[in-house]
């Protein structure tokens, strides 16, 4: 938002008939931005995972967690249940239909 004045609840009520029309407007604008590829902000969780992957922090934590699980004896059972690395997600795999 380029304006410096804050939007209050009263100002939003003047701009939109109901809170539902505001939500529908935001959803429509978001779909348009995604379709154009103009997404300036993204999911914070995905950004955090990318940051951790960039600096190799997450892989070190996963290796340490694996060692702790195997040392406790219950690690083999947990390791078998979680096949693959479910924490690492490729952000390019997400599209609008995944968001519910």
Swiss-Prot record:
Name the domain of life.
Bacteria
Chain intervals for the UniProt region annotation (Disordered):
68-100
Q: Which spans does this entry mark as compositional bias, Basic and acidic residues?
A: 68-91
What family, per the record? Belongs to the chlamydial CPn_0121/CT_031/TC_0300 family.
Protein name, entry field: Uncharacterized protein TC_0300
Question: What organism is the protein native to?
Answer: Chlamydia muridarum (strain MoPn / Nigg)
